[in-house]
Each structure stands twice: as structure tokens, then as C-alpha cells.
A protein has these predicted regions:
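Short acidic, low-complexity intrinsically disordered linear motifs used
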Residues: 120-142
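Short, extreme N-terminal segment that most often corresponds to the first beta-strand
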Residues: 1-34
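Basic, mixed-charge low-complexity alpha-helical segments
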Residues: 4-5, 19-20, 99-107, 111, ...
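Short, flexible beta-strand-to-coil junctions
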Residues: 1, 60-63, 133-136
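Acidic, low-complexity, intrinsically disordered interaction modules
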Residues: 37-108
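Charged/polar low-complexity intrinsically disordered segments, enriched in acidic residues
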Residues: 110-121
């Protein structure tokens, strides 16, 4: 098993969350992202906490949230971009854990990497459509 990236000592406990809970969340956040946003690494406890961070609001259920943010490469890239750009309010009960995740996303370079992947997926799809249309209209012209 990989070494956790975050330790409880990095976080402050408060009346809503312990430092251990924050470390557990931050480490699971990294694991979820590093495993390619696999649904099997998206348990209910993580959904409930994640859906209330980075300006998200809870969706109807875990599956709806997953579909909205992790079902395509573009959505995964947009999710990580939101982690970086959503206004940050230090002092909120979970803000130190959010900031740790935000810093990890920034250092990982994943937004740019996923952006390249999105561009390649779009190009592949567009080239396939171009080939289909050329074949269709070349037949008609012949």
C-alpha cells in the first residue's frame, strides 16, 4: 500500500471534523484521482464529503454526482479545474483539507494532462466524423 500523502498533524480539528477525518479525506481524494476516478473508489462517505467541497452542492445521489463530474475525460478535467479555481475561504470547517487537495492538484499537473487528452479525444471523434461524411458524399458525387 502506498504511503499516505497527508497526515493528521497537517490539519486542525474543529467541532465538526477531526484532523484524522480531514487526513482520511485528503488521502482518499488523491487515491480517487490517481486511480483514474474509478467508481469503485467512490464510496458513499467520500461522495457525501466531496459533494460539499470546492463549491459543489450535493446532487440527488452519488451516481448523479459521479455522472456529472467523472463520467468523461472532459468532466474529470473540469472537476479538477474547479478544485483550483473555486474561491477559497480559509476558516471554513473543512478549508485546510480542501486547500491541501487544491495544492496537490496544482502540483500534479493533471489539469493540463487531461486537457491534452480531451483535445485528442475531440480530434479523434472529429476525424472519424470527417471520414464518414467524406465517404458519404463522395459516393453521392460518383
Amino acid at each position: 500500500m502506498k504511503q499516505p500523502k497527508f497526515a493528521a498533524a497537517q490539519f486542525s480539528g474543529n467541532d465538526q471534523y477531526t484532523a484524522e477525518e480531514k487526513a482520511r479525506f485528503a488521502n482518499h481524494f488523491v487515491r480517487f484521482v490517481e486511480t483514474g476516478f474509478k467508481p469503485t473508489v467512490f464510496p458513499d462517505w467520500f461522495y457525501r464529503r466531496l459533494s460539499c467541497t470546492f463549491g459543489h452542492i450535493a446532487h440527488f445521489d452519488r451516481n448523479g454526482f459521479y455522472e456529472a463530474w467523472f463520467s468523461t475525460t472532459r468532466r474529470r478535467r473540469d472537476f479538477l479545474q474547479r478544485c483550483l479555481t473555486h474561491p477559497f475561504y480559509m476558516g471554513a470547517p473543512f478549508s485546510d483539507a480542501e486547500d491541501a487537495c487544491r495544492q496537490w492538484v496544482r502540483k500534479s499537473g493533471l489539469v493540463a494532462k487531461l486537457g491534452v487528452q480531451v483535445a485528442l479525444e475531440v480530434e479523434t471523434k472529429e476525424r472519424a466524423e470527417l471520414a464518414r461524411l467524406q465517404a458519404k458524399y463522395e459516393k453521392e458525387a460518383a
